[in-house]
Amino acid sequence: MSVEETGWVTVALVGKTRGNRGEVTAVVLSSRPERYQDLQEVFLFGPGLPEAGERREVEEAWYHLQTLVLKFRGVDTISEAESLYGAEVRIPASQRISLDEGEYFESDLIGCEVVDRQSGQSLGKVSAWDDGGGSGLLVVGDLLIPFARAICVEINPAAKRITVELPEGLKDLNRP
């Protein structure tokens, strides 16, 4: 893995210190918690770190009371661990875990053009993902679209396009 690589994926956010050996807690940004136990090397991005990211070897990764704990090689004191608070833990996109058919990375949906199947009109581009619903929500302008098979009938992240069949009245729910 090299720092020059593009296409980073943020997989966690560094939280508070834990213990006195330089361990940190982390906010998990994956629906597959087991993925963290295989991490060997990551790049940290954030205030006080190089703009291109700082390579860190993961010495250990485990869960304590449903909280991810990370131990980075060379981070051995509380003060060293505190300096990492808030950093984004990233990996190259090429090292993302494999998905099952019909599963998508949220980051791949951002920027997709959303097209109404009935009218053929563009509703805009997905600007964000919101976990606020059972299936998640695509944020398209001021419109929140449930990410459900019955609504998102064609999903093609490679073509940056999502075709939707919106239930009657959905457009009016979120409009000012």
From Swiss-Prot:
Keywords: Chaperone, Cytoplasm, Ribosome biogenesis, rRNA processing. It is found in: Cytoplasm. GO terms for molecular function: ribosome binding. GO terms for biological process: ribosomal small subunit biogenesis; rRNA processing. Binds ribosomal protein uS19. An accessory protein needed during the final step in the assembly of 30S ribosomal subunit, possibly for assembly of the head region. Essential for efficient processing of 16S rRNA. May be needed both before and after RbfA during the maturation of 16S rRNA. It has affinity for free ribosomal 30S subunits but not for 70S ribosomes. This is Ribosome maturation factor RimM. The gene is rimM.
